[in-house]
Amino acid sequence: MNVRRLPIPTAVVAAAAALGLGALSACSSGGAAAGDTDKFDVVASFYPMAFLAEQIGGEHVHVTSLTQPGQEPHDLELSTQQIVRLQESDAALHLKGLQPSVDEAIAQSEVGTKIDAATLTSLEDHEDEHGHEDGHEDEHGHEHEHEGGKDPHVWLDPVKYAEVAEGVGKAFEKADPDHAADYRKNTEALVGKLHDLDAAFETGLKNRKTDVFITTHSAFGYLAERYGLIEEAISGLSPESEPSGARVKELTRTAEADGVTTVFYETLVSDRTAKTLADDAGLKTDVLDPIEGITDGSRGDDYFQVMESNLKSLQTALGAK
C-alpha cells in the first residue's frame, strides 16, 4: 500500500550491503516484498500479533512475522534483512517487553505507524517462584527481563487479548482510512469470538477438583487470574530459566497437598524438566501451549484451536466436570 515510505537509514543500507543482501525489498514468508505490495504492509513481532493483524486486516493487509514458526520468540535477534523489511513497512505491531531486539529496532525505525500492544491493555506483575519480579538467567547465563517487571503474556487471557484487538483495529482505521469500515467490522467479529472463548473457559472450568496447575514456564498468570486458578511454575517468565532443587521439592509437596495430577510443558521448549518433576512426583505430563508460535506440533492450526485444546487439557488436569 505504501501509505508512508521513508528513506532507509544509511547504516542499514551499509549493513545490508556488507552481508551481500543485494536489493533492499526484503521478501516476507509469503514471498511478497514487505514494502512493495498494494496492501497495507504490517510487520508483526511474533504469532499473537501477526494473528491479530491478519484477522483485523483481512484482505487489505500483507502481514510479515519477524518470528518464524518454531522459533522461541523471547530470544529473537533480528537479521539485517528483517530490519530492512521493518523499515519498508507501513506499520509495526509488537508487544513491548517481550522481545528486546524487536523493541529496539522499532524504536529506531521510521515506520509511520507503531503499535505497542502493551499500551492497549493493563499489564501486571506476576512474581516468579521466589517472589521476585521477573529477571532470570538461562542455562547460557543470559539475562531475560521484561519491561518494568511486567508479565507480557496478555494474549492468553481472551478478555485482555480482545482489548488489544480493539486497539489494533482503531490504529489500522487511522492509518488506512480507506478501509476503516472493514477493519471495524473485522475487529468486532474477532472481539466477539474472544468473548465466546472467555465464556467457554468460564463454563468449562467450573466444578473442578483443584485450582492448582503446574507449568514449566510462568506464561499463564493472566489466564489463571481470569478464571480463579493458581499457576505454579517450575521456572519463571523466561522459558529457559532453570529451577532450583528446592523449588522442585516444593512443587512435589504442592502437587501432593493440592491434588495436582499433571505437569504441563509447552511445544517450543524442552520438556525435560517437566518430565523429571513428573517422574519424581508420580504425575502425568501434558501440553499447555502459550501460543507463542504455531508449528506442526501445535494442537491446532490457529489461536482459537490451540486455546480450545488448552481448555480441554486444563479440564482434565483440574478434574473439571
Question: What does each model-identified segment do?
Answer:
Residues N2-K321:
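Extracytoplasmic metal-acquisition and chelation regions
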